Amino acid sequence: MGMMQEFKAFAVKGNVVDLAVAVIIGGAFGKIVDSLVQDIIMPVVGKIFGGLDFSNYYLPLNNQDISLTLVEAKKLGAVFAYGSFITILINFLILAFIIFQMVRMLSKLKRSEPPAEAPATPEEVVLLREIRDALKK
């Protein structure tokens, strides 16, 4: 079998195609969660804590003014952008929780499926067993 035929057989297998679809859907779902965190959750959290935008929280690692925005501060030197980290951490926790729930649901569905019936014993095997039993007598 040539290399191209082997690759085609590998690529067409269900698991590889399923994995590719999962990666694409996961990328799109990640963008939805990003939007959920940045556009809905973080503004509410910011409002609770006095209208602050967490994504602009940083500590300068040099002698620069802390009243600058994060983008301006990054242009002037190194910064410890802990607000951005908090936002990304919340994003990750939401995504991990949703994926955990999906895996949990799929496990329950798999457990509830009835086990597959064993294939019927081939007639040759049945015949050989009968011959064996007859010879034992």
Swiss-Prot record:
Keyword field contains Transmembrane: yes
InterPro entries with a match to the protein in the record: Mechanosensitive_channel_CS, MS_channel, MSC/AndL, MscL_channel
Annotated Pfam families: MscL
Location in or out of the cell: Cell inner membrane
Topology class, membrane: Multi-pass membrane protein
Cystine residue pairs: none
Subunit field text: Homopentamer.
Cited function: Channel that opens in response to stretch forces in the membrane lipid bilayer. May participate in the regulation of osmotic pressure changes within the cell.
Family listed: Belongs to the MscL family.
Protein name listed in UniProt: Large-conductance mechanosensitive channel
Lineage: Bacteria, Pseudomonadati, Pseudomonadota, Betaproteobacteria, Burkholderiales
Gene: mscL
